[in-house]
């Protein structure tokens, strides 16, 4: 009997088009890592998978299959099949996959067929698709010339990148702005999910008309998301564009990012009182994160200024007092650190300019 399956040559199309895919692996496998367009509807739950796996090791495939059928039958089986049918009724052109494209895919496909649906499963499963994405990231520096957008903290690099078709937003994929104050409200993805999302973004970029791959200047770690080594090495060799911005514009932008956006985001999630408490904690923890570099005395000064700004914000509904510690943070910490970093890249800098000049340069190159 020939199996209805999607060949490995189709992986690129699946990812570029965000093709709907049903992941039949157990929840514990899905949580470790999955693909951006995938939805988990398992054949077996975690404990069932564990029992079947142990049986397979001790007694072989036939005994494991028998045990699997005894664990997933009757009403439990019907509930699982109903969930699959619901997914494919909403995504009639969808595919399914398991870890290797083996027995679990075939069994899921068989049960769906018995229920009246013939759904293709993906050859090679999660393991082969994941390997394809890893290779995509490793090959990316050779696909299109990389350009690195650098700029002093608060210069608006992310705002600029989001307006450019050449760009892939690494910080957006990592859910982190890459600095002590860079935390998002949403948690960061797992390392595997970060890499998978990056690879899919790169595949889409490769299929676009963009001549360059424009990336923000990042360190190896963006929060706790690590850039894959070959990709990061490519970034370290790429030409650098330096985005320039006035101090006043930088202060206004950082007041909005560190104070207005974070405060409103916490309140949205937690309510007025708990949200403000979480916001105050975010500021305190962010300063504590750079305590070693600041030194105890300067760290304590920052905490006092932040506490005063929070008190004024509460009593007068005025956030402008936060500008004092933000400016101090730039002068004492971010700007000297940036200058040190950009001096090391001086031989790679190919253009400097403000937002308008940078857009014009990229439009012409």
Swiss-Prot record:
Active site (catalytic residues): 98
Boundaries of every Rhodanese domain copy: 15-138
Superkingdom classification of source: Bacteria
Top EC group: transferase
InterPro entries with a match to the protein in the record: Rhodanese-like_dom, Rhodanese-like_dom_sf, SelU
UniProt GO BP: tRNA wobble uridine modification
Keywords, ordered alphabetically: Selenium, Transferase
Catalysed reactions, semicolon-separated: 5-methylaminomethyl-2-thiouridine(34) in tRNA + selenophosphate + (2E)-geranyl diphosphate + H2O + H(+) = 5-methylaminomethyl-2-selenouridine(34) in tRNA + (2E)-thiogeraniol + phosphate + diphosphate; 5-methylaminomethyl-2-thiouridine(34) in tRNA + (2E)-geranyl diphosphate = 5-methylaminomethyl-S-(2E)-geranyl-thiouridine(34) in tRNA + diphosphate; 5-methylaminomethyl-S-(2E)-geranyl-thiouridine(34) in tRNA + selenophosphate + H(+) = 5-methylaminomethyl-2-(Se-phospho)selenouridine(34) in tRNA + (2E)-thiogeraniol; 5-methylaminomethyl-2-(Se-phospho)selenouridine(34) in tRNA + H2O = 5-methylaminomethyl-2-selenouridine(34) in tRNA + phosphate
GO molecular function annotation: transferase activity, transferring alkyl or aryl (other than methyl) groups; tRNA 2-selenouridine synthase activity
Transferase in keyword set: yes
Presence of keyword Transferase: yes
Enzyme nomenclature, EC number: 2.9.1.3
Function text: Involved in the post-transcriptional modification of the uridine at the wobble position (U34) of tRNA(Lys), tRNA(Glu) and tRNA(Gln). Catalyzes the conversion of 2-thiouridine (S2U-RNA) to 2-selenouridine (Se2U-RNA). Acts in a two-step process involving geranylation of 2-thiouridine (S2U) to S-geranyl-2-thiouridine (geS2U) and subsequent selenation of the latter derivative to 2-selenouridine (Se2U) in the tRNA chain.
Subunit structure: Monomer.
Entry's family note: Belongs to the SelU family.
Name assigned to this protein: tRNA 2-selenouridine synthase
Originating organism: Shewanella halifaxensis (strain HAW-EB4)
Gene name of the record: selU
């Amino acid at each position: 009997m020939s199996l209805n399956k999607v060949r490995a040559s189709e992986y690129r199309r699946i990812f570029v088009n965000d093709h709907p895919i049903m992941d039949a692996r157990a929840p514990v496998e899905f949580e470790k890592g999955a693909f951006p367009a995938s939805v988990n509807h398992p054949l077996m739950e975690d404990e069932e998978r564990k029992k079947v796996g142990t049986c397979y090791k001790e007694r072989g495939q036939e005994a494991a299959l028998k045990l699997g059928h005894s664990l997933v039958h009757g009403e439990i089986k019907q509930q699982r099949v109903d969930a699959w049918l619901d997914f494919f009724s909403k995504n009639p052109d969808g595919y399914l996959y398991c870890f290797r494209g083996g027995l679990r895919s075939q069994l899921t496909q068989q049960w769906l067929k018995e229920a009246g649906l013939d759904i293709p499963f993906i050859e090679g499963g999660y393991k082969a698709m994941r390997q394809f994405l890893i290779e995509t990231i490793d090959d990316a520096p050779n696909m299109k010339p990389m350009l690195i957008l650098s700029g002093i903290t608060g210069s608006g690099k992310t705002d600029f990148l989001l307006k450019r078709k050449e760009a892939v937003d690494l910080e957006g994929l990592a859910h982190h702005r890459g600095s002590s104050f860079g935390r998002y409200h949403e948690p960061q993805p797992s390392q595997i999910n970060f890499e998978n999302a990056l690879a899919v973004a790169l595949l889409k970029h490769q299929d676009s008309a963009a001549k360059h791959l424009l990336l923000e200047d990042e360190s190896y770690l963006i929060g706790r998301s690590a850039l894959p080594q070959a990709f990061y090495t490519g970034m370290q060799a790429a030409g650098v564009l330096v985005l320039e911005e006035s101090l006043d514009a930088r202060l206004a932008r950082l007041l909005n990012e560190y104070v207005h956006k974070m405060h409103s985001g916490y309140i949205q999630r937690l309510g007025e009182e708990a949200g403000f408490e979480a916001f105050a904690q975010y500021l305190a923890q962010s300063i504590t994160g750079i305590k070693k570099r600041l030194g105890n005395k300067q760290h304590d000064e920052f905490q006092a200024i932040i506490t005063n700004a929070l008190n004024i914000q509460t009593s007068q509904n005025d956030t402008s007092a936060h500008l004092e510690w933000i400016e101090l943070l730039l002068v004492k910490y971010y700007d000297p650190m940036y200058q040190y970093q950009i001096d090391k890249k001086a031989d790679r800098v190919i253009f400097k300019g403000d937002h308008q000049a940078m857009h014009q340069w990229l439009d012409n190159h």
